[in-house]
Amino acid sequence: MAAALLRELGALWVPNLRIWTTQMLRVLPQSCIHTSTSLDISRRWEKKNKIVYPPQLPGEPRRPAEIYHCRRQIKYSKDKMWYLAKLIRGMSIDQALAQLEFNDKKGAQIIKEVLLEAQDMAVRDHNVEFRSNLHIAESTSGRGQCLKRIRYHGRGRFGIMEKVYCHYFVKLVEGPPPRPEAPRTAVDHAKEYIQQLRSRTIIHTL
């Protein structure tokens, strides 16, 4: 009798738990749910090459080509890759290749290979006439797979080592690179700060 009662209670508890979990996931904001870069960006990055834009009007200027390319699961640190990715951001394709050619880091040669692949893809698939008429609009890295392995120590002890991987993403846009923004001076920062103070909302006042 007691066993049958427990089975009935368990059968009722499982559907209620499922309904409660579904409702809580709907209420929770999306920012509370962590998704890694491999799930969030890597799956959608190269799919942006398949975007079809509406036809342009007769007098409208030509839309520049955009090339999205990436390489996943690189045996390299994402932090070391980020410094190299930031180095070439905003450069023309020839200038970026020249900078990476004389950089002795391992990630520089990997990024150079990815840029050459993206350059060939631009001419072959995206109707880009001049392969040098490209600039790097976006260049970033992301966290890849992280494998934990045993590191053997002396006297029968051990530690945990991590084998980290990273992703590299690049976006090439047809045309010359945009002009760099002028550096902001202390006066500009002071004006912005004063404007923020003047636009404050003070409650319980006129």
Swiss-Prot record:
Pfam families cross-referenced by the UniProt entry: Ribosomal_L22
One cellular component (GO) term of this entry: mitochondrial large ribosomal subunit
Protein location: Mitochondrion
One annotated GO biological process: translation
Gene3D superfamilies on file: Ribosomal protein L22/L17
Presequence range in chain numbering: 1-40
SUPFAM superfamilies: Ribosomal protein L22 (SSF54843)
Keywords for this protein: Mitochondrion, Ribonucleoprotein, Ribosomal protein, Transit peptide
This protein's record includes keyword S-adenosyl-L-methionine: no
Top-rank taxon, per record: Eukaryota
GO molecular function: structural constituent of ribosome
Family: Belongs to the universal ribosomal protein uL22 family.
Assembly mode: Component of the mitochondrial ribosome large subunit (39S) which comprises a 16S rRNA and about 50 distinct proteins.
Protein name: Large ribosomal subunit protein uL22m
